[in-house]
């Protein structure tokens, strides 16, 4: 992501990427300069073991103007046209310094699908639709800064998995027991040991490689249209920021394996069958593991309401908004009282009939 200058073919002014297109636009004369990829450029999967060895031994290096935040430890590149004095991740004042960083360069990215004006409209719609929010939140909430378009680093992993397991299958038995002159129903589970093997192929398990944003919010921006990935091209970064990864390739794969295991356990339970399942042991082998280092588009901003600042993120492709928000405890209390009243009426009507 080295600093590169892209000039307009018509007037020579600086260009910026126009979201939602495959062109760079000159804001001086309006001329559009198409982004044409090499016919040999592809979005390639990289062998995990080979990539890990490269990361440890001789990852490609480049010198960029890196913005370092001392509060949240974010390191990211800002386009020179972006006049930012605060970290877009946590709002702390930032210092621009040029230094050499060593990292795996991205192999692909998803271009932004809409501009900052559209991002603001999506934020306002999200704010208006919040349940149990104060009535005046839309009128009083003020965004702290302009919207910053940031390419956030991700790893994606593919793997062919084979999992051996041992466990127990539970079958529910309902029987009637006579106790003197009375009968009662007894429910019990009969367990039998079982073992087996399940297999599943995983494609593009995404892992956030940034620690500067709450992972939960970024996870809820999914799904990403990864089928629209384009080979990495610095021209798509003009007018936007790009963060360097903070989660390494190996640590990212550990997170990916945890995501895979959740799915695999569901497969095992289906394979065990019965009414209830217990997994005693599970051993998974991972084969044909490949990865991609990609940049995904996120709009960042925060707003002030009362004495607090609330951060939020927007998927730069789908417009999905996630973030912190204020709550109206008065509305929540009234809703709770209403629910209690409904339950009370139900018990009074139907309980009295019984």
Name what the model sees in each region:
Residues 61, 104-304, 352-353:
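Charged, low-complexity helical/coil segments in non-catalytic cytosolic or luminal regions
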Residues 8-11, 26-29, 69-72, 87-90:
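Short cysteine-rich clusters marking metal-coordination/redox-active sites
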Residues 324-335:
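Juxtamembrane/start-of-transmembrane alpha-helix segments at the extracytoplasmic/lumenal side
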Residues 21-25, 38-44, 81-86, 99-105:
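Short cysteine/histidine-rich zinc-coordinating motifs and their immediately flanking basic loops
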Residues 17-18, 35-36, 78-79, 96-97:
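Short, non-ligating residues that shape and space the ligands of small metal-coordination modules
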Residues 344-354:
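Juxtamembrane boundary at the C-terminal end of a transmembrane helix
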Residues 296-322:
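Extended, hydrophilic extramembrane loops/domains of integral membrane proteins
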Residues 3-5, 23, 62-66, 84:
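Residues immediately within or flanking Cys/His clusters that coordinate Zn2+
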């Amino acid at each position: 992501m080295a600093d590169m200058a892209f000039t307009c073919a018509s007037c020579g002014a600086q260009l910026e990427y126009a979201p939602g297109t495959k062109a760079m636009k000159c804001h001086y004369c309006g001329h559009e300069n198409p982004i044409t990829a090499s016919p040999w450029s592809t979005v390639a999967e990289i062998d995990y073991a080979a990539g890990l060895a490269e990361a440890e031994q001789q990852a490609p290096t480049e010198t960029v103007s890196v913005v370092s935040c001392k509060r949240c430890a974010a390191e990211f590149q800002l386009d020179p046209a972006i006049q930012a004095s605060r970290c877009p991740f946590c709002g702390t004042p930032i210092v621009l310094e040029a230094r050499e960083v060593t990292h795996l360069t991205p192999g692909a990215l998803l271009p932004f699908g809409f501009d900052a004006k559209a991002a603001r409209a999506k934020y306002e719609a999200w704010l208006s639709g919040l349940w149990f929010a104060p009535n005046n939140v839309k009128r009083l909430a003020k965004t702290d800064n302009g919207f910053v378009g940031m390419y956030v680093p991700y790893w994606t992993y593919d793997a062919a998995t084979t999992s051996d397991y041992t466990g127990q299958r539970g079958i529910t038995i309902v029987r009637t027991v006579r106790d003197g002159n009375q009968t009662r129903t007894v429910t019990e589970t009969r367990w039998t040991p079982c073992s087996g093997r399940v297999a599943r192929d995983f494609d593009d398990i995404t892992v956030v490689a940034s620690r500067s944003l709450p992972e939960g919010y970024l996870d809820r921006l999914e799904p990403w249209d990864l089928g629209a990935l384009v080979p990495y091209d610095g021209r798509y970064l003009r007018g936007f920021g790009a963060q360097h990864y903070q989660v390494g390739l190996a640590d990212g794969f550990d997170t990916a394996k945890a995501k895979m295991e959740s799915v695999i356990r569901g497969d095992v339970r289906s394979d065990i069958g019965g009414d209830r399942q217990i997994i005693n042991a599970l051993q998974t082998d991972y084969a044909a593991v490949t990865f991609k280092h990609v940049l995904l588009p996120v709009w960042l901003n925060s707003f002030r309401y009362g004495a607090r600042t609330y951060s939020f993120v927007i998927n730069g492709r789908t417009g999905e908004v996630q973030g912190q928000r204020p709550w109206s405890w008065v509305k929540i209390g009234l809703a709770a009282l209403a629910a209690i009243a409904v339950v009370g009426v139900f018990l009074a009507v139907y309980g009295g009939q019984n």
